[in-house]
Amino acid sequence: MNLSQSFLLYISIIVTAFVRGNHQNATLTVKSKVDYSEFKKTVNDNKNLLINHPTKDIRNYLFKLVDGDIFDYWEGTPWDFYGKTLQPKTGSIACGYFVTTTLTDLGFKIDRVGLAECRSGDMIKKLCMGIHSFNSLDKLSSYLAKQPVNSVFIVGLDFHTGYVIKTTTGCYFMHSYYFKKQGVIKEKIDESPALSSNKFFMIGSLTANENLLRKWIANKPVM
């Protein structure tokens, strides 16, 4: 079995697990099988496995990729204000570029540079549904408590942005953190200094945007 066949088998296992509701048992990791270039190519080549599936399956697959695979590859990649690396753990990545680069790597046909360099609120409005604004972390937390698990959001702060991910174990902020150039980290939202020190929050859901998900699977431009 060659590398591409191996990855196709992996994708089939993951998709089947999600359809059957057993995604927590799908423990194979992409990182252990292929390098990042092959990961990007094969994810893009094999999204059509879900093209006739209900939106729930597409949503769960995107959640799995962002929460698991993307973080596994990118964890620890340093932050820099001008960081635009295309390769995890090589060079540096700014917060906006972390979001748009990883979405591009998963096959979303978006304006990677334009969205990374615009205001985070504008990026959220172009990519997300169910957009809300809050003036405290407590209010944001209360909102997230009512949202479904396996959800992926983009959050915009005063001068920062990243993913919020809701899992069965809680809500996490995944972002390229500027403090001491820590770079890509994932932390519980109630333990995040970046969130707790902020005064304004705009959040929108990627996984609730069915039109975006369908265009992603069909390899069509989403904007």
Residue ranges and their predicted role:
Residues 5, 102, 147, 156, ...:
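A generic structural signal for short, solvent-exposed coil/turn residues
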Residues 12, 108, 151-153:
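Conserved active-site beta-strand-loop modules that form the wall/rim of enzyme catalytic pockets
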Residues 22-116:
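N-terminal capping segments
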Residues 37-45, 138-146, 211-218:
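Polar/charged alpha-helical tracts
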Residues 117-186:
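...with weaker cross-activation on analogous glycine-rich loops/strands in unrelated enzymes
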Residues 180, 187-223:
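Low-complexity, Gly/Ser/Thr/Pro-rich intrinsically disordered linker/tail segments
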